[in-house]
Amino acid sequence: MAKRKANHVIPGMNAAKAQGMGAGYNEEFSNEPLTEAQRQNNKKRKKNQ
């Protein structure tokens, strides 16, 4: 399955942040990326593991 280009990246943000995330995940978070502890407790990510 070919990787699709993330279409939810806002110009001016770091485009590399979108890689490896499902589309739409970033809209719920503030601009700074999650810390490692938050990532472990993130329910959306936990569902994918």
From Swiss-Prot:
Its GO biological process annotations read: asexual sporulation; sporulation resulting in formation of a cellular spore
Q: Where in the cell is it found?
A: Spore core
One GO cellular component term: endospore-forming forespore
| Induction of the gene | Expressed only in the forespore compartment of sporulating cells.
Similarity-based family = Belongs to the SspO family.
Q: Where is this region: Disordered?
A: 24-49
HAMAP family named in the record = SspO (MF_00665)
Q: Which cysteines are joined by disulfide bonds?
A: none
Question: Keyword annotations for this protein?
Answer: Sporulation
Q: Which organism is it from?
A: Geobacillus kaustophilus (strain HTA426)
Query: Pfam families per the record?
Result: SspO
For this entry, the protein name equals Small, acid-soluble spore protein O
Q: Organism classification, top ranks?
A: Bacteria, Bacillati, Bacillota, Bacilli, Bacillales
